[in-house]
Swiss-Prot record:
Organ and tissue specificity: Expressed by the venom gland.
Primary location group: secreted
Subcellular location: Secreted
UniProt feature coiled coil, ranges: none
GO cellular component: extracellular region
Keywords linked to the UniProt accession: Secreted, Toxin
One Gene Ontology MF term: toxin activity
Protein name from the UniProt record: Hainantoxin F7-28.42
Length: 30
């Protein structure tokens, strides 16, 4: 799945790991 807005995905251990990104003053866990 592609991340929306500015939420980066870290690829580790062959699996997409969800990253907590600080955007617009709100923590978005996508």
């Amino acid at each position: 799945k592609q991340a929306t807005c500015s939420i980066p995905y870290e690829y580790s251990n062959g699996k997409f790991k969800r990253t907590l990104y600080y955007s617009n003053g709100v923590y978005a866990n996508s």
